[in-house]
Curated annotation (Swiss-Prot):
Plays a role in peptidoglycan recycling by cleaving the terminal beta-1,4-linked N-acetylglucosamine (GlcNAc) from peptide-linked peptidoglycan fragments, giving rise to free GlcNAc, anhydro-N-acetylmuramic acid and anhydro-N-acetylmuramic acid-linked peptides. The record marks 185 as: Important for catalytic activity. It is found in: Cytoplasm. The lineage of its organism: Bacteria, Pseudomonadati, Pseudomonadota, Betaproteobacteria, Neisseriales. This is Beta-hexosaminidase. The gene is nagZ. It comes from Neisseria gonorrhoeae (strain ATCC 700825 / FA 1090). The active site is at residues 187, 258. One of its GO terms (cellular component) is cytoplasm. Keywords: Cell cycle, Cell division, Cell shape, Cell wall biogenesis/degradation, Cytoplasm, Glycosidase, Hydrolase, Peptidoglycan synthesis. GO terms for biological process: carbohydrate metabolic process; cell division; cell wall organization; peptidoglycan biosynthetic process; peptidoglycan turnover; regulation of cell shape. InterPro entries: Beta_hexosaminidase_bac, Glyco_hydro_3_AS, Glyco_hydro_3_N, Glyco_hydro_3_N_sf, Glycoside_hydrolase_SF, NagZ_Beta-hexosaminidase. Belongs to the glycosyl hydrolase 3 family. NagZ subfamily. Its EC number is 3.2.1.52. It holds the Pfam family Glyco_hydro_3. It catalyses: Hydrolysis of terminal non-reducing N-acetyl-D-hexosamine residues in N-acetyl-beta-D-hexosaminides.
Length: 361
């Protein structure tokens, strides 16, 4: 059977269960689609996951990019057979107790284990690290944040990024320019952060600047309004994405929208309007999750935006470890020691640091 050559489009969709239905196969062959995000509902066990990712990748060439939210703590989509990952604030606690060096070493090990285990199952990308500061206000962020100190967040995120690279994965910093100060959960409401740009620059933006300089591959903006900067949510704002992120910070990587079905995005209109505004603001790729009907509505008559960088940016997000290489790494004593170390950092309290996120439970 000839695999069709279909360039990756700018939409990331999802699927319902453990295997692809015929309807989903046809949807994923649409030129609008370039990637797929998996959730806990798509995971039964490791062998099933490997079969699913192979099935997805066999549909077309270049292969669809497969992503997942797999941060640790409350946001770890795959559990059985995977190392239980700590919430990121555990690394911040190590920073406070044992110092920066110990915390950075731990963060590197977490990133390495996280990425290698996903790579072994055919996953290209985890949407991590969270760069939001822990201001103590936002339950949906909570212990997903490394720390309140911008330097600690940046250094721990950079160490995690280096670990991810050892496991074949790129990084995606979120939620630009910072979701940690607001109380509202943008899955449910459209939060507002009333601080000035100078205040944001002095704290929340610092990790994004540092990580951008250090090779962060992707960014996901927040569905949060910062009215002193722009009346539009960051993910719909040319000021935030084209002027501040691209021009001022100098970020060259991929901009993924956060899920366009979240309540924080719904005020922009229907799904076609949300996507149009996202692309015009500067997003390369939009996520449409948990609503296949909206994916179908979006792709009906969809015109792929003119983005000369899209193909290269998608390609850059591909996993860099081949199957044989990752299997060999998994068998080494060093990697198995890293798994044991990371598992020892996790505890039941890691899942209790705030509300559930998407499909975290």
């Amino acid at each position: 059977m000839t695999v069709p050559h279909i360039p990756r489009g700018p939409v990331m969709a999802d699927i319902a269960a453990f295997r692809l239905t015929e309807e989903e196969k046809q949807r994923l062959l649409d030129p609008a689609i370039g990637g797929i995000i998996l959730f806990r509902r798509n995971f039964q066990n490791i062998e099933q996951l490997k079969t699913l990712t192979a099935e997805i990748k066999a549909l077309r060439t270049p292969e669809l990019i497969i992503a997942v939210d797999h941060e640790g703590g409350r946001v770890q989509r795959f559990i059985e057979g995977f190392t239980r990952l700590p919430a990121m604030n555990v690394l911040g606690q190590i920073w406070d107790k044992d110092g920066a060096s110990a915390a950075e070493t731990a963060a590197g090990q977490v990133g390495r284990v996280l990425a290698t285990e996903l790579s072994a199952c055919g996953i290209d990308l985890s949407f991590t690290p969270v760069l939001d500061l822990d201001w103590g206000n936002c339950a949906v962020i909570g212990n997903r944040s490394f720390h309140r100190n911008p330097e600690a967040v940046a250094r721990l995120a950079l160490a995690l990024q280096k670990g991810l690279a050892k496991g074949g994965m790129k990084s995606c910093g979120k939620h630009f320019p910072g979701h940690g100060f607001v109380e509202g959960d943008s899955h449910l409401v459209l939060p507002e952060d009333g601080r000035s740009l100078d205040e944001l620059e002095a704290a929340d933006l610092a990790p994004f600047r540092i990580m951008s300089r250090e090779g962060m591959a992707a960014v996901m903006p927040a569905h949060v309004v910062y009215p002193q900067v722009d009346t539009k949510p960051a993910g719909f704002s040319e000021i935030w994405l084209k002027q501040i992120l691209r021009r001022d910070i100098g970020f060259k990587g991929v901009i993924f929208s956060d899920d366009l079905t979240m309540e924080g995005a719904c005020g922009a209109g229907g799904i076609k309007e949300r996507a149009r505004i996202s692309f015009e603001a500067g997003c390369d790729i939009v996520l449409v999750c948990n609503r296949p009907d909206l994916v179908d509505e979006l792709r009906d008559g969809f015109t792929i935006p003119d983005n000369q960088d899209l193909a290269g940016r998608w390609q850059y997000m591909e996993n860099s470890l081949g199957h044989e290489a990752v299997q060999a790494v998994m068998q080494t004593m060093g990697f198995q020691a890293a798994q044991a170390f990371v598992a020892g950092l996790a505890s039941p309290q890691d899942t209790a640091g705030g509300v559930k996120v998407g499909e975290a439970f």
